[in-house]
């Protein structure tokens, strides 16, 4: 396996080291290439992502990302627009995958959380995030700013198909989320895609939520969900809410996936670089380790993916609220997957 590693900034460096420790405990064929991308490089020479970086990254089977950014020194949005979004668009990461599971030992803010285990499939290359907009008469009383949500049949069809496939492999229930009563053009395209592709998956139950209703249900009845599919913006909102109801983002992994496998997909913990605790050895590496499990599953190694997920589940279940040490968690999980 040829793996590109972008450990990034802050605690990204620490949690990525533990994720690699666990990966190498289950696989002895991992060849890693480290990339200096993130706040440190930007502050050093002003670079975010060069064409040479991109071409080199494309030569790998997958990308493991730690965390990017330092809000103390890098202006907001610089690395998102200059590094993360270009990676997703230029590597055609059409599917942003976010499993959301309430692990034993994790504390949900919900009073009666019940069993929470669902996946959000977020469209990753279109919608309001594709940069189709502009400003006229900036700085005047007549200023006009626009952002255009771009939705294509090609883009929507492939993410909807991916979501149906995942639902078929899970509990056979798909919920699509939009705002069709107001966003009639984009919503209509999404609805036609759902209806068309749904005919190929007659065993999958389909329902629909407006985005505002989905935020309510995710807080009041999250166990109703199995697979959620939605657009880029709504998915961005829902996945953060999903992280909150499952006890925070310490156990939240994600994948930015090219479903065609023509480009390397990228896997990362949801959390940020947390510079306030960087270097203290107290960051929870479980989200980064679960990102490795997502990566292995994407690459067809289901057995080792399940092995890692079980080890993380056991790790979470065994916690008693005491402070954790980053390397100790990595050591325990690495030992567990080798047992």
From Swiss-Prot:
The EC number on file is 1.1.1.85
Cofactor note from UniProt? Binds 1 Mg(2+) or Mn(2+) ion per subunit.
Q: Could you name the domain of life of the organism this protein comes from? A: Bacteria
Q: How does it assemble?
A: Homodimer.
User: Which reaction is recorded as catalysed by this protein?
Assistant: (2R,3S)-3-isopropylmalate + NAD(+) = 4-methyl-2-oxopentanoate + CO2 + NADH
Q: Which NCBIfam families does the record match to this protein?
A: PRK03437.1
Supply the name of the protein: 3-isopropylmalate dehydrogenase
- Its family? Belongs to the isocitrate and isopropylmalate dehydrogenases family. LeuB type 2 subfamily.
GO CC terms in record: cytoplasm
> Quick one: which pathway?
Amino-acid biosynthesis; L-leucine biosynthesis; L-leucine from 3-methyl-2-oxobutanoate: step 3/4
Q: What does this protein do?
A: Catalyzes the oxidation of 3-carboxy-2-hydroxy-4-methylpentanoate (3-isopropylmalate) to 3-carboxy-4-methyl-2-oxopentanoate. The product decarboxylates to 4-methyl-2 oxopentanoate.
Q: What UniProt keywords are attached to this protein's entry?
A: Amino-acid biosynthesis, Branched-chain amino acid biosynthesis, Cytoplasm, Leucine biosynthesis, Magnesium, Manganese, Metal-binding, NAD, Oxidoreductase
């Amino acid at each position: 396996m040829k793996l590109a590693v972008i450990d990034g900034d802050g605690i990204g460096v620490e949690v990525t080291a533990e994720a690699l420790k666990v990966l190498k405990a289950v696989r002895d064929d991992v060849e890693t290439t480290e990339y200096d991308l993130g706040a440190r490089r930007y502050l050093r020479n002003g670079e975010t992502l060069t064409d040479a970086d991109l071409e080199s990254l494309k030569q790998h089977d997958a990308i493991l990302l730690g965390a990017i950014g330092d809000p103390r020194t890098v202006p907001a949005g610089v690395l998102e627009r200059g590094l993360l979004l270009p990676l997703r668009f230029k590597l055609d990461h059409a599917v942003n995958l976010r499993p959301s599971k309430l692990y034993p030992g994790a504390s949900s803010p919900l009073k009666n959380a019940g069993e929470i285990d669902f996946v959000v499939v977020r469209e990753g290359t279109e919608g309001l995030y594709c940069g189709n907009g502009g400003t006229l008469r900036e700085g005047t009383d007549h200023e006009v700013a626009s952002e255009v949500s771009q939705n294509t049949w090609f883009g929507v069809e492939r993410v909807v198909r991916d979501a149906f496939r995942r639902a078929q492999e899970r509990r056979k229930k798909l919920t699509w989320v939009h705002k069709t009563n107001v966003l009639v053009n984009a919503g209509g395209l999404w609805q036609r895609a759902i209806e068309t592709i749904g005919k190929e998956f007659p065993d999958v139950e389909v329902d629909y939520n407006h985005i505002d209703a989905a935020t309510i249900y995710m807080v009041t009845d999250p166990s109703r969900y199995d697979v959620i599919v939605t657009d880029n913006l709504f998915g961005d909102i829902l996945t953060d809410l999903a992280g909150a109801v499952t006890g925070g983002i310490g156990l939240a992994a994600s994948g930015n996936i090219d479903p065609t496998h023509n480009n390397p997909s990228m896997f990362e913990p949801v959390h940020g670089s947390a510079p306030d605790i960087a270097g203290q050895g107290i960051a929870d590496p479980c989200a980064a380790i679960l990102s490795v499990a997502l990566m292995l599953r994407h690459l067809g190694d289901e057995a080792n993916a399940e092995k890692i997920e079980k080890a993380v589940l056991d790790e979470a279940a065994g916690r008693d609220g005491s402070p954790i040490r980053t390397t100790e968690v990595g050591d325990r999980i690495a030992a567990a997957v080798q047992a």
